[in-house]
Amino acid sequence: MNGISHRSVCLILSVFFALLGPSGVPVARAQSTADEIQRRLNKLEAEIVKGEDVSAILRLQRAYGYYVDKGMWEDLADLFAEDAVGNYPNGVYIGKDSIRKHFFMNVGGGKVGDIGLGDNRLYNHMNLQPVIHIGPDGRTAKGRWRAMAMLGRYGERSFASWADGVYEITYIKDRGVWKIQKLDYHSGFGASYATGWIVPEKRTASRASRTLAHPADKQRQMACEGFPEACIAPFHYDNPGTKTGGPIWTSSDAPSSKDEPVSGGTIDIQQRVNNLARRAMMLHDEQEIENLQRIYGYYFDRRMWDQVADLFAEGGTIEIGLRGVYAGRDRIRKSLDLLGPEGLRNGQLDDHIQLQQIVSVAPDGQTARARAREFSMAGAYEGRGTWSEGIYENTYVKENGVWEIKSLHFFPTFITDYDKGWGKDARPAPTASSEFPPDGKPTETYEIYPNFHIPAFHYRNPVTGNYPQYPKGEGRPMDEAIQAAMASVKSGGGKAMVSETKENTEAILAEAERQIQRVKDYYEIQNLENAYGYYLDKNLWNDIADLFAEDASMELAQRGVYIGRERVRGFLTNVFGKEGPVEGRLSNHVHMQPVIHVSPDGQTAKIRSRMMQQLNLGGRASMGASIYENEAVKEDGVWKYKTVHTYNTWTAGYEGGWAKNPGKYLPGQSEKYPPDAPPTLIFEMYPTVYKIPFHYRNPASGK
């Protein structure tokens, strides 16, 4: 009977029949036949494998961005299949070896084997906004990602620039490991930091025409090289609000080969149920930790220090830059006052965007580690603005079923004055306070940009399973830091993830089925959110409207509320202009940091997310930021928006930025196409600070 012994079937049936309710109706119908039990287990495992596939692809592509950041070209090349194709602006590279040479020689500017960037160079490469779909065969997948890059050189021959683009990537599962099969990069824009994203007076030479140390294997045929041209990078997916584009994977009852029969050709059902429950829980835990880290960022934005401190375990620690280590929740709370008093005040901006998490949960599900990125915009009105970016290497612990931060360690990459930019200004990392000294000295000493430093990776290469290949000289982490980071994610010493009592087999199985469905829901809602941003980029109003349920609503800024999908469609087309991208206009809407909570019944969800805008609407470069508090509903198995509510936080002209040139005007209700209801909240943007509602309580304290 497909690897399950007759004795096991009899045992499980007897357990299930023993679980009759008061009315005599079975708690589950799986006890009717051994085939039904087998079907449920096979379907559960097939769903878990697909969830693990999505998790692995997210990990793979996020690692890609971290490796590019630090010039870890060997680890980067290892993410590609042997026969992979890299379709970059300067040409097409065929085969892993050619792609590897491209990274070392063309991107790194050195010879093969030269790992690392060296001092005075910035090459930040943020991989954001994933839309992932697993192919029906389970062996291929496709993903859309946004790349946002900050490039520069400090000192002699200094420069600073921005770059943005879209990856459309095909992945392949090779002997159980996901790799990049084909990567197509579509340029969005490239811009000097000094001017921002303005229409250039004359186009620079195409990157394809430049002399390369490692020539491309084939010339790229590009339909568009990005702004100021009007083009759309092809979408690999149908609209996620439709039946064909909504599912992130196709469900099936096909058994997996992951659980091989034990000796004697049989698998104990209880063992299999427990193994599957453990795997489903680990996927759920990954998402819980992603939510936790993103919530930390939202609290930090508003200097909600009491809430930030409550996210830490009682014996937790915090280490920001070279300030030293503060231990214990009370000491953590007091240390945060060094960054300013509780609560953001008018005239202050302190955005801390949490990005690109790679989470590793311990086998027992009681501890975890994660690498994450923070991109920050801070400053004071009519004062000074700053950009900064850095890396977290954190640990987490599950206490009483709730994830908390055990240790938070933030490594700044760079801190720079807004007016000067990273080509001309580089600030040192903050050091220990004499006013409120830390409990311990910094666990690692290093210098930030313009010096080169790599925070040690806690995870191995997602493809090879090998330790990272660090440079031997400049930028290499301390040996002690490498050893500490690469230590296995150890058991927290708590209770086992699932009970092994046979009497609760049905409860464990039902909970695992529920959890993997919530995992799938989370991923599909993430696709919905990120697709919304891509459609906004290109003024695809009809695609945006098709993401909404029939009775949904939209409220943007102070424009009022539009109720019903067709009213949303009419609002977009009548107020914002014609459908599609426009020559000479840039309208980037970078969607980030979703905190997703699915209801217990799996039919509704609430989402907090963030958007950064990069705009050129008439020759003037500008930017802005918003917070969304959205709701989603599942209709016929497809997630759609129930409400989209945008809270604008700030806008600014690129020249001067948020500190010296904030845009205070908020558009009101349209006379041409009036809303169905007035705005639900009247507010003013930065430099005014107003309260944006949270749909959730603190996940650790419940406050």
State each model region's role:
Residues 31-66, 70, 78, 246-298, ...:
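Short, low-complexity N-terminal intrinsically disordered segments enriched in polar/charged residues
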Residues 24-30:
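Sec/Tat signal peptide C-region and signal peptidase I cleavage site
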Residues 10-23:
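Bacterial N-terminal signal peptides
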Residues 140-142, 164-203, 367-369, 389-426, ...:
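Short beta-strand edge/turn micro-motifs at domain boundaries
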Residues 1-6:
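N-terminal secretory signal peptides that target proteins for export/translocation
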Residues 125-127, 162-167, 352-354, 387-392, ...:
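Short, surface-exposed coil-to-beta transition loops
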Residues 188-190, 197-263, 425-499, 658-703:
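A hydrophobic membrane-anchoring alpha-helix module
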